[in-house]
């Protein structure tokens, strides 16, 4: 009887593990267009939503998207609230101390500065500027390291808040991913412009997973390798980033 009970318990554990692998819970912010955002219909949309669905189709898993605010997005992963982060998160050494990353699914791409058109800001020798960044990002770390001594770094909970405060004149410049700033400039009616040199920080964007989830990491990497090879990733980049790339294949 004891052996039967133990066997049943073991089967239950295996069944639970199998069921867990049938669903891929993807943590995302839903506030960082065109990577991930809530559309007019109140649904999650964007590059990473489509890519997540492509990964699930390739692996035979079912996608479940879980929204999280940006600041606690890594702690929520570690706590088990979802299985992988897909939220425009750059691969950095600091983050790798806490979590692992898949291979990148968006190549390293420059960050850029944005300001009111004609503001005439000298970002090479800035002084007294109010520089807006989204908190806990690679841009925030760069701004603190390079500009905090002579300028005020203003941290925002979301990218959209930083742009709103720039438009309202509450900050002088915003530093963010160029891929996210492109549509902002395009839709500003000429009120905003990108300027200054490209800022290369981060090692591309990848999916964050818990350190112990090595099998899941391997599964996701296999899927991404296949989706790059068959052109799916490049097609989604072209769709969501105005055909501008960067791409994995020529």
Residue ranges and their predicted role:
Residues 107-114, 182, 186-221, 243-250:
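Periplasmic-binding protein-like
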Residues 15-20:
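Sec/Tat signal peptide C-region and signal peptidase I cleavage site
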Residues 49-50, 65-75, 135, 154-168:
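Short helix-initiation/N-cap motifs at beta->coil->alpha
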